[in-house]
From Swiss-Prot:
It is found in: Cell inner membrane. The chain crosses the membrane at residues 4-24. F(1)F(0) ATP synthase produces ATP from ADP in the presence of a proton or sodium gradient. F-type ATPases consist of two structural domains, F(1) containing the extramembraneous catalytic core and F(0) containing the membrane proton channel, linked together by a central stalk and a peripheral stalk. During catalysis, ATP synthesis in the catalytic domain of F(1) is coupled via a rotary mechanism of the central stalk subunits to proton translocation. Component of the F(0) channel, it forms part of the peripheral stalk, linking F(1) to F(0). It comes from the Bacteria. F-type ATPases have 2 components, F(1) - the catalytic core - and F(0) - the membrane proton channel. F(1) has five subunits: alpha(3), beta(3), gamma(1), delta(1), epsilon(1). F(0) has three main subunits: a(1), b(2) and c(10-14). The alpha and beta chains form an alternating ring which encloses part of the gamma chain. F(1) is attached to F(0) by a central stalk formed by the gamma and epsilon chains, while a peripheral stalk is formed by the delta and b chains. It comes from Paracoccus denitrificans (strain Pd 1222). One of its GO terms (molecular function) is proton-transporting ATP synthase activity, rotational mechanism. NCBIfam families: PRK13455.1. This is ATP synthase subunit b.
Length: 184
C-alpha cells in the first residue's frame, strides 16, 4: 500500500505543476492519471500481480529443477567418464602385458629355433665327419688292398724266379696267413 501511495504522489506531481484546474475533464494529465489508476486498480482487483508472481515462482521452480537435473546429469557424466578412463587404463595395461608376453614368447621361440638350427648343424657336421671317416677308412682299405696285391704280385714274381714250386706254395700259404692275421 505504501508503494501505491508513493506511486500516486509521483504520478500526480507533474499534473499539479500544469496550468489550469487539475481536476477537470478537459485536463489531459488528469484523464491519463485516472486511466492509469483505473488500470492499476483492475490489475489488483483481478489479482494479476499474484498470478504473475505465481507464474514466475513456477518458472523459478522449473529452472531450479532443471538445474538440479543438469547437476545430476553432470555428476553421472563425470562418473561415466571416470569409469571410461579407468577402463582405458586397464585396456592399455592389458595391451602392454600382451605386447610384453608376445615379445617374451618371440624371444623364446627365436632361442628355440636357434638351438634347433644349432642341433641340426651339429648333426649334419657329425654325419659329414662320419662320412669323411668312412671314406677315409675306405681309402685306407683300398690302398692297403692295392699294396697287398702289389706285394703279392711282386713276391710271386720274385719267388717264381728264385724258388721251387714247393717253396712257392709254402710261401703263398704263409703270406695268406699273414694277410689274414693283419686284416682281422
Amino acid at each position: 500500500m505504501k508503494r501505491l501511495s508513493v506511486l500516486f504522489a509521483l504520478v500526480a506531481s507533474p499534473a499539479l505543476a500544469a496550468s489550469g484546474p487539475f481536476f477537470s475533464l478537459r485536463n489531459t494529465d488528469f484523464i491519463v492519471t485516472l486511466a492509469f489508476l483505473l488500470f492499476v486498480g483492475i490489475l489488483v482487483y483481478f489479482r494479476v500481480p499474484q498470478i504473475v508472481g505465481g507464474l514466475l515462482d513456477k518458472r523459478a521452480e522449473g529452472i531450479r529443477n532443471d538445474l538440479a537435473e543438469a547437476r545430476r546429469l553432470r555428476e553421472e557424466a563425470q562418473e561415466i567418464y571416470a569409469s571410461y578412463e579407468r577402463r582405458q587404463r586397464e585396456v592399455k595395461s592389458q595391451a602392454d602385458d600382451i605386447v610384453a608376453n608376445a615379445k617374451r614368447e618371440a624371444v623364446a621361440e627365436a632361442e628355440k629355433a636357434k638351438k634347433a638350427l644349432q642341433l641340426s648343424i651339429e648333426r649334419r657336421l657329425k654325419a659329414a665327419e662320419e662320412q669323411i671317416a668312412g671314406a677315409e677308412a675306405e681309402a685306407v682299405r683300398a690302398v692297403r688292398d692295392r699294396a697287398i696285391q702289389t706285394a703279392i704280385a711282386a713276391a710271386t714274381e720274385i719267388l717264381g724266379k728264385q724258388a721251387s714250386p714247393a717253396e712257392r706254395s709254402a710261401g703263398i700259404d704263409k703270406a695268406i696267413d699273414e694277410v689274414a692275421q693283419r686284416l682281422n
